[in-house]
Amino acid sequence: MVSSKKTIDKNKTQVIGKIIQVLGPVVDVKFSENNIPKIYDALVVDNNGKKLVLEVEQNIGDEIVRTIAMGPTEGLRRGLDVINTNSPITAPVGNEVLGRMFNVLGDPIDEKPDLDVKRLPIHRDAPIYEELVTTTEILETGIKVIDLMIPFTKGGKVGLFGGAGVGKTILIQELINNIAKAHNGVSVFAGVGERTREGNDLYHEFIEAGVLNKTCLVFGQMNEPPGARMRVALTGLTIAEYFRDKKNMDVLLFIDNIFRFTQAGSEVSALLGRMPSAVGYQPTLSTEMGSLQERITSTKNGSITSVQAVYVPADDLTDPAPATTFTHLDARIVLDRSIASLGIYPAVDPLASSSRVLDPEIVGQEHYDIALKVQITLQKYQELQSIIAILGMDELSEEDKLIVQRARKIRNFLSQSFFVGEKFTGRPGVFVKVSDTVRSFKSILNGEVDHVPETYFLYSSTIDNVIEKYNKDKDK
């Protein structure tokens, strides 16, 4: 990580300290008695011609501050001069950041020119209570399983829970694509501790999809020091807050992956010598999560709707990291490996997932009733599966056989072709309106398509699409 040259030039006359100890990403710096930096101040050091930024985490006495490096510390040595910028790390803000890609320090990493724009500190207080507003406006995503079973609200927080390789990132990509095209919305994507290759692919996919000019990307990937991974979510959030507060916009903030934010905090906590808490996590886990999540909210100026991918270690939802995240969310989308193994994508488990706004007063009575009937049908099918496994379908009553057939059709119909997956699947992506989704599931539940085999429901957009495919094959 390298800070911008302007920052260095501007601060040439600032207070200078000396490095007295380097322990991996932890650097201790000694200042004079009257010039000790504040917690979270950014310090700058020249590391063999490269500018390295250190963030003050602790004041350990004797005029010494303990810092975490935002970049590699190879080549640092004792006695080097360190400049105090008298300011926290800052992020660039404004319309100019759209279509650009930055690191944790707000420096461009897309090989395009530097930006001379306003910058804001990444450490800020959450909006005060009087500024908050509670909205219950539904955000249409065009993804059937989400719009029907787990509706989003503008200004809400949504968690995507799932283990490795079940489709969290591609679901986020589809949401960005759909929101940009359907709602003309601005998105900020914070890549926290994920694969660099995925970030590169995402950038080029955004260019191909034509949504890059509505998106700002901020990356602190898994090859970077824990300090960068811990702070990059705050950089992305600061950019989103500016669009909300100063431009009065509804913004989408995507964080992939919020678990890596916790993981980086755990690494930093251990490096700073704090006593670990449950399962080895940092004792400040809830505080760190709260300080991030409380800033993601709706105000009278605009809203930030957040979608956060949550890696679940060993698929254990009781792990402290995902469990702490749960408490802040309005909706939870749980991705299930067993559904993915059936070839059904998005692999959303409609029984484990939930949304606070699936309420008849918000989504309407018909929508609520259909969603509830879908849940009941799938739940009943799950209960019957053990009987089917032992005795077979023939031992079921006629009523139960009908439930099983409809449940399998519902399960298949919850699949959907994604725009961002077109080149992998060969199937064109579809955006399905909420009204079409509700109407289609109503037809299945009412028995209007009991005569159509379940295979026709897989990757069909609406019930009209199912009937069209069935009639076409029947005519052959």
From Swiss-Prot:
Gene: atpD
MF GO annotations: ATP binding; ATP hydrolysis activity; proton-transporting ATP synthase activity, rotational mechanism
EC category: translocase
Species for this entry: Mycoplasma capricolum subsp. capricolum (strain California kid / ATCC 27343 / NCTC 10154)
Keyword Ion transport applies: yes
Role, per record: Produces ATP from ADP in the presence of a proton gradient across the membrane. The catalytic sites are hosted primarily by the beta subunits.
InterPro entries recorded: AAA+_ATPase, ATP-synt_VA_C, ATP_synth_F1_bsu, ATPase_a/bsu_AS, ATPase_alpha/beta_chains, ATPase_F1/V1/A1_a/bsu_N, ATPase_F1/V1/A1_a/bsu_N_sf, ATPase_F1/V1/A1_a/bsu_nucl-bd
The protein's Enzyme Commission number: 7.1.2.2
Annotated binding of ATP, by residue: G162, G163, A164, G165, V166, G167, K168, T169
One Pfam family, short name: ATP-synt_VA_C
Keywords: ATP synthesis, ATP-binding, Cell membrane, CF(1), Hydrogen ion transport, Ion transport, Membrane, Nucleotide-binding, Translocase, Transport
Membrane topology of the entry: Peripheral membrane protein
Protein name: ATP synthase subunit beta
